[in-house]
Amino acid sequence: MTQFASPVLHSLLDTDAYKLHMQQAVFHHYYDVQVAAEFRCRGDDLLGIYADAIREQVDAMQHLRLQEDEFQWLSGLPFFKPDYLNWLREFRYNPAQVCVTNDNGKLNIRLTGSWREVIMWEVPLLAVISELVHHYRSPNAGVDQALDALESKLVDFTALTANLDMSRFHLMDFGTRRRFSREVQQAIVKRLQQESWFVGTSNYDLARRLALTPMGTQAHEWFQAHQQINPDLATSQRAALAAWLNEYPDQLGIALTDCITMDAFLRDFGIEFASRYQGLRHDSGDPVAWGEKAIAHYEKLGIDPLTKTLVFSDNLDLPKAVELYRHFASRVQLSFGIGTRLTCDIPQVKPLNIVIKLVECNGKPVAKLSDSPGKTICHDKAFVRALRKAFDLPQVRKAS
C-alpha cells in the first residue's frame, strides 16, 4: 500500500470543542491523573492493513502546534483561562503515547499517558483513520459527491418541513471524527451555513475559520474517569457533575446522561444540578423515551422544561431530527447534532463505526454502560458488576 501523500491534519484545533473544554478542566483539577484508552471498530471492517499509514500520520501529529492567530481566537472565548491557554500553546502530541498494531487484520490502538495529554488524541486520530481508509477504498469520491448528496437531502428536508414552524429548530455539525475527509467536512459546513437553522459546529478549526459558534461540553470519559478518581463509586457521577460546575459554573452546561444509563443519571441529577445545568444530551437508547423522561424529571423538580435544552446526537439524520422536533418542539428547547450522516454520507461509501474510549484511570478499570447494550465498553467484568451494583442496575448486559 502506498503511503498517504501528506499529513491529514493541519491544525491543532481540528478536533471537537469538548476535547479542549475537558482538557482545561483536567488541567486545573486532575493534572497528574494517568489513563489508558483503546480503539474499537464496532463493524466488521478489517482495518489492520492501514496500521503503517496510520502510524505515519500519528508521527506527523507531533509537529502540530497552536498558532498565534488560533491562540488569540481562543483567548477571546469566555470560558478559557490564561494559564490553560499558555500551557496549550506549548502542547505537542507525543506519538510515544500511541501503540498502533495490525493483529491478523484487526487494527489495535492503545493510548497511555497523562489524561491532560491523552485526551487530545481521540477525535483527530479517528478523523485520520476515517480519511485514510476512505482515501484507499473510495479514491474517486469526494467533495462534489458529498455536496450532491447533501443537496438532495436538503430538498427532501424542505418538503418534510414545509408546514412546520422551524424557528426553534437548531442543527449542529458533529461530524469530525468519522468524516470522509477534512475537505468534505468543510464543504458540508460551508453549505449548511446558508441555512437559518444551522447554528454551529463541534470542530474548533472550522468554527474559527468560518466564524461559527463552537459547540460542545463534555464526553463519556469525564464521567468514566471519576469512577476511579472519586473514592466512592456510587457517588462518582455526582462528583463528575459537581467538578464540571466547579470549572464552568455558568457556561458549557449541557450534561451527557448515558455513561451509566439515563435512569441512573436522573437519580443523581437533583434540583441543584438540574437548576444549574442548561440541559441534557442524548447519545444512546430510544430518543423519544429519553426525552419524555427528561421532561418528566424537570417537571417533577418544579422546573419549566421550556427553560432547558435537550440535545440529540445519537445516530441522527435530518428526517430523524425533524421527527424529534415535531414530537418535542412545543415542550422544551431543542438542538440536534448530526455527524456521520452529514460528513460521510456519499453514495457507495460505507462510513466507519469507530470509537476510542477510556478503559483505565490511574491503572484501574472504568466503564461506559450507556442506554444501548452494544455500546458497553470495559475489559473487567467484575468492575461492570460493581458499577451496576453501585448504581442499582440489573446485572443483564455483558461488557464487550
Swiss-Prot record:
Q: In which pathway does it act?
A: Cofactor biosynthesis; NAD(+) biosynthesis; nicotinate D-ribonucleotide from nicotinate: step 1/1
List its EC numbers. Answer: 6.3.4.21
The record's section on InterPro entries has: N/Namide_PRibTrfase, NAPRTase_N, Nic_PRibTrfase, Nic_PRibTrfase-Fam, Nicotinate_pribotase-like_C
Which residues are recorded with the post-translational modification Phosphohistidine? Answer: 220
Q: Which CDD domains match?
A: PncB_like (cd01401)
Q: Which residues form a coiled coil?
A: none
Q: How is it modified after translation?
A: Transiently phosphorylated on a His residue during the reaction cycle. Phosphorylation strongly increases the affinity for substrates and increases the rate of nicotinate D-ribonucleotide production. Dephosphorylation regenerates the low-affinity form of the enzyme, leading to product release.
- Keyword annotations of the record: Ligase, Phosphoprotein, Pyridine nucleotide biosynthesis
- Record-level GO BP terms: NAD biosynthetic process via the salvage pathway
What Gene Ontology terms describe where this protein resides (cellular component)?
A: cytosol
Query: Which GO molecular function entries does the Swiss-Prot or TrEMBL record give?
Result: nicotinate phosphoribosyltransferase activity
Note whether Phosphoprotein occurs among the keywords: yes
What is the top-level taxon of the source organism?
Bacteria
Q: Which reactions appear under catalytic activity for this entry?
A: nicotinate + 5-phospho-alpha-D-ribose 1-diphosphate + ATP + H2O = nicotinate beta-D-ribonucleotide + ADP + phosphate + diphosphate
Function summary: Catalyzes the synthesis of beta-nicotinate D-ribonucleotide from nicotinate and 5-phospho-D-ribose 1-phosphate at the expense of ATP.
Question: Family, per the entry?
Answer: Belongs to the NAPRTase family.
Q: What is the recorded name of this protein? A: Nicotinate phosphoribosyltransferase
Q: Gene behind this chain? A: pncB
